[in-house]
Amino acid sequence: MDTEPLLSPLSPSPHLLHPLPEHAEVSTFSPPLSPCPSPASSYKERIIFGAHPPPPPPPPPPPPPPPRGRRYYRRVSGDDLDVPSCSSSPSPPSDEENPPPNPPSLFDFIGGRTNLHRSRTAPAMAPLNAAAIAAAAASGDSRNPPPPPRRPAIVLHAFLFLLAYLAMGVTFYAALPGNFTSSAGPTHPVADALYFCIVTLCTIGYGDITPATPAAKLFSISFVLIGFGFVDILLSGMVSYVLDLQEHLLITALKNPRSVRKHRHNYIFDLKKGRMRVRMKVALALTVVAICVGVGAAVLKRVENLGWLDAVYLAVMSVTTVGYGDHAFRTLAGRLFASAWLLVSTLAVARAFLYLAEMRIDKRHRAMANWVLSRDMTVSEFLAADIDNNGYVTKSEFVVYKLKEMGKISEKDIMMICDQFQRMDSGNCGKITLSDLLESHQLVTDLNEKKKGKKS
C-alpha cells in the first residue's frame, strides 16, 4: 500500500501573498479648493478624511494549479483564518465560487470607520439651538445684571459731614462760652467756636483755647474722636477724589490730537498708563504746601503783626500740625482766616507725604520688576510655575508666576479667579463654552425667580 508522505520532498507550492499597503498604487487626491496638493497633504487628508472609493482593480491572473496528489490551502471566509482542507482528489477552486479578496490597505481600514466624517472645517463653537440662544438673550435682557460698584458721592458726603461736625461744635461752644478759657481773650463766640473746631479737627493744638469744665472736657473727648475717626477720613477722600478728577481732565486734554505741543508734556504726564508721574505729583504737592506756607506767613505778618521769621515759623508749625502753642491766632480776622487756611493746608501737607511714600514704593517696585525680569528661571522656579504639573510651563503659567514674583498679584487673587472659573465651568472640562455660559445664566435666573417667589 502506497502511503503518501506528509511532507513533499519537492519544492513547496507557491502561496498566495497579498500585496502590502505601501506597495499598492495610490491615486492622487485633489481637494476641490487646492488645485495642486503636495503628496504630504494628500496623505494627511486621506488619513484624516478617509480614502476615496478606489477604482475597480483588474482581475488577478488565475493561480497555477497545484501538482496532482498534493495538498493545498484555500482561504475560507469566516474569521479570516487559513483552514487546511484535506482532499485526496482535489480540484482547483473556481474563481466564481471563491473570488480573490481585494488587497487591504491602511486607507480602506481608516475609511471604514463610522466615527470619522469628511469635514473641511471644525465648528467654532458647540452647536446650540437658536431657540435656546434667543431665550437666553431674552432672559439676560429681562434680568438686569448688577451694576459695577461706583464711587459714591464722596464730595457731597464729606461736605455734609463737615457741616454737621462744625455745627455741633459751634452750637456747644456758643451756647456755653464760659466752659472754655482763652489765653488771648475772646473775640466773637461764633468765630472763636469755629476756630476751636478747626484747630481740633486738624489736630494742631495751639493751646490758646482750652476746655475748663468737666462737661467741656467730655465734649472735647467725643468731638476729637469723631473728627479723627470719620470726618478727617472723608475729607482726605474728598481731596483725593478732586485731585484724581483734575488729573483725569488734564490727561484727557493732552490726549486730544488738536492740542498743541502735547508731546512736550510727557515728562509730567504718563499718557501710556493714563496717569501723572509720581515725581511730578510730589513736586506739585510740595509746591502747594509752599504756596500755603507763603500765603499763611503773609497774612500772619499783616493781620497778627508778626515779623517774617515768626510768621513763617507759625505757618510751618500750623500746616505740619505741630502747634507748640507759643504763637497762635489772636485777632478776629486771623481766626476767621485760620478756619479756612488750616483746613486746606493740613490736608495738602498730608497728601504730599502720601505722594512721597508712593514715590518710594514705586521706585522699589520698579527695581524688583527689573530684577525679576532680568534673571533666568531655575529648576525650582520651573516646578513652582508648572501649575497643572504636566511637565512644561505654558505662556500663561509663566506670566502668572512672574506677576506673583513681582508682587503684582497674590495667591489669594489667583484662587478667587480660579474659583470663579470653576463655577462657570459646569462641565469640569477645563474650558468655558457658550453652552456652559448659557446654562449658568439660566441657573441664576431660576434662583432669582425662586427668591422672588419666596418673598412674595
Swiss-Prot record:
Keyword line: Calcium, Ion channel, Ion transport, Membrane, Metal-binding, Potassium, Potassium channel, Potassium transport, Repeat, Transmembrane, Transmembrane helix, Transport
Region (Disordered): 1-112
A GO-annotated cellular component: plasma membrane
Intramembrane segments: 192-211, 310-329
Binding sites annotated in the UniProt record for Ca(2+) 2: D425, K431, D436
Cytoplasmic face residues: 1-152, 244-279, 357-456
Mitochondrion recorded as keyword: no
Annotated ranges, domain EF-hand: 373-408, 412-447
PANTHER family, per database record: POTASSIUM CHANNEL, SUBFAMILY K, TWO-PORE POTASSIUM CHANNEL 3
Domain free text: Each of the two pore-forming region (also called P-domain or P-loop) is enclosed by two transmembrane segments (2P/4TM) and contains the GYGD signature motif which seems to be involved in potassium selectivity.
Entry similarity comment: Belongs to the two pore domain potassium channel (TC 1.A.1.7) family.
Function text: Inward-rectifying potassium channel.
Protein name: Two pore potassium channel c
